[in-house]
Amino acid sequence: MGAPPGYRPSAWVHLLHQLPRADFQLRPVPSGFAPQEQEYQQALLLVAALAGLGLGLSLIFIAVYLIRFCCCRPPEPPGSKTPSPGGGCVTWSCIVALLAGCIGIGIGFYGNSETSDGVSQLSSALLHANHTLSAIDHLVLETVERLGEAVRTELTTLEEVLEPRTELVAAARGARRQAEAVAQQLQGLAFWQGVPLSPLQVAEDVSFVEEYRWLAYVLLLLLELLVCLFTLLGLAKQSKWLVIVMTVMSLLVLVLSWGSMGLEAATAVGLSDFYSNPDPYVLNLTQEETGLSSDILSYYFLCNQAVSNPFQQRLTLSQRALANIHSQLLGLEREAVPQFPSAQKPLLSLEETLNVTEGNFHQLVALLHCRGLHKDYGAALRGLCEDALEGLLFLLLFSLLSAGALATALCSLPRAWALFPPSDDYDDTDDDDPFNPQESKRFVQWQSSI
């Protein structure tokens, strides 16, 4: 099959494509991209379910750890203010985990941007392909209308002027037949006219979904960043209420991180299967949606020497007919104008129409060549399966770092806030200290009584 320009599956695609797949009954499933088949759908759902399994194991581990911490902690002697051994290690482990989470957030922002760039490249390729197809339809319609107008007006007028000379009328009628033949052949070149599938609509739908996906990830990243920063602030200020609130928020973000991880993993595996051999699926799907012949679709999607141009015969016949019209008009101008001066005006108008038609014809030849649309196809593949897939892998790394960091923080935070001094300890200050809040209050009352 013809490879689009720059079409090279990456090492990540090969690695993900080689991963084993199974359905809900744990039976092996082929790695070919077949989203319409139930077994393949179950295989992707099973990949996503692995993240749910990881979430369940994380919650069980955190629950067991916290229960052991609460139930098996030795009682502190009354009035003891000596910090328990290992308290500093617990706090620092929590801080390191949160800093690792911040690094993961940076990776997540980069991955989100890469994914958005890849989807934008896909949308741009679809818009460019839509422009090419619209230009073909417009040129065909304009040329056919111009030829029809010439047949109805100039050629009819010319036949009326040349009526005394039957051989000249026969030549004019020959030009009419050739013009009608050209119009008929050109109408068959607008292969996308009336097709229900619109690349413009697909691009708009893709952009619409991508906007909400990008926004959702930005909100998730910002939420985790705020949780990490406020947790660090609570640890620095030894604020129990802030740390408790951030612990609850960390649990929420942990669930969201595992959920996004499952979605990213399933999408990455599906994209790798698609990108390993995209041509058969794209050909079949486009043929189902458009109803176009496989010859036309194979010519544009494969674009190699093994597939001939399905419009070559129409283009050849149109070019020959235009050449015949040109020679007939030259003969009429040479024979008829000296005898019928009034024939010069319709002949000049016909020559002008012929020149415009030939110009449009050469543009159609260039637009109908497979290079342009095949290049758009390659750009769409590179955007979706290189940039977008790379971004998904970075988002997957972010979710993994986030889940690990938050799980560590959830285990460490309860032990950290247990080491915070109680609020009563702040009242145990020297009465002679001028910065003592109680002493400052008595000083203000003394000044007001003077």
Curated annotation (Swiss-Prot):
Residues 428-450 are annotated as: Disordered. The keyword Membrane applies. It is a multi-pass membrane protein. The chain crosses the membrane at residues 44-64, 89-109, 215-235, 241-261, 391-411. Its main location: membrane. It is found in: Cell membrane. Homotetramer; disulfide-linked. Homodimer. This is Protein tweety homolog 1. It comes from Macaca fascicularis.
